[in-house]
C-alpha cells in the first residue's frame, strides 16, 4: 500500500513538471446524509489536481485532496473521532460552453483515521467558471465502505494556476 501511494505521488509531481495546462487548488464544504448523517455534522476538504486539455471541450487529469468529517457532539456521550479520507482519483470534465462544465472523479479513498479502511471513491461534479481561472462547483461525494457509504453534498471553489513550459 505504501509503495502504491509513493508511486502515485511521484507520478503526480513528475507529471506536473512537464505539464502545460493547469494545477487545480480548491476547498469545499459538505453536508453528509444517509449512513453518516447521525454521526457527522458537516465535513470540509481541500482538493489538489492537474488537468490537461484533451480537446476543445474535454479535460482529463488526476485529483487528490483531504476530506475531514466533523463528528456530532452529544451531551454526556462518548466523543466520536473525525472521519478522514485521502482520495486519489482520475478526473474528467466536459465543457459544453465556455463557463459550464460537468464530469467526475473516480478512484480510491484511503481512510486516515483509526478503523477506517477507505473504499471506492466517486464524485460527479457540475461547475461554473466565473472569471478566467476560478470555478464554483456543486458535487456529490460517495465512498463505498464495508457495510456503509460515505455520502455528502458539496459546494466548493476551485482555482486554476496556469503552468506554461519555459522556452529555451
Question: Residues of each region from the PLM?
Answer:
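Mid-chain, well-packed structural core segment of small domains
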Residues: 95-119
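Membrane-embedded beta-strand positions of outer-membrane beta-barrel proteins
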Residues: 25-29, 60-64, 90-92, 102-104, ...
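Predominantly the C-terminal beta-signal and adjacent terminal strand-loop region
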Residues: 24, 70, 117-168
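Glycine- and aromatic-enriched membrane insertion/assembly motifs of diderm outer-membrane
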Residues: 33, 37-89, 95, 135
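Transmembrane beta-strands of outer-membrane beta-barrel pores
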Residues: 29-35, 52, 64-72, 106-112, ...
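Short glycine/proline- and aromatic-enriched beta-strand/turn motifs that initiate or cap beta-hairpins
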Residues: 19-61, 150-168
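Cleavable N-terminal export/targeting peptides
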Residues: 1-22, 165-168
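Outer-membrane beta-barrel strand-turn architecture
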Residues: 17, 52-56, 94-100, 130-132, ...
Amino acid at each position: 500500500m505504501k509503495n502504491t501511494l509513493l508511486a502515485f505521488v511521484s507520478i503526480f509531481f513528475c507529471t506536473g513538471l512537464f505539464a502545460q495546462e493547469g494545477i487545480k487548488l480548491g476547498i469545499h464544504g459538505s453536508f453528509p446524509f444517509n449512513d453518516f448523517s447521525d454521526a457527522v455534522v458537516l465535513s470540509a476538504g481541500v482538493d489538489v489536481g492537474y488537468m490537461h486539455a484533451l480537446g476543445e471541450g474535454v479535460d482529463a487529469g488526476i485529483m487528490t485532496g483531504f476530506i475531514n468529517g466533523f463528528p456530532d457532539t452529544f451531551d454526556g456521550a462518548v466523543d466520536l473521532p473525525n472521519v478522514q479520507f485521502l482520495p486519489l482519483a482520475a478526473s474528467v470534465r466536459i465543457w459544453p460552453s465556455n463557463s459550464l462544465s460537468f464530469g467526475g472523479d473516480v478512484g480510491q479513498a484511503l481512510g486516515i483515521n483509526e478503523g477506517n479502511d477507505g473504499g471506492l471513491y466517486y464524485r460527479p461534479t457540475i461547475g461554473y467558471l466565473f472569471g478566467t481561472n476560478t470555478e464554483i462547483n456543486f458535487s456529490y461525494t460517495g465512498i463505498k465502505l464495508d457495510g456503509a457509504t460515505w455520502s455528502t453534498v458539496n459546494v466548493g471553489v476551485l482555482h486554476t494556476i496556469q503552468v506554461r513550459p519555459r522556452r529555451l
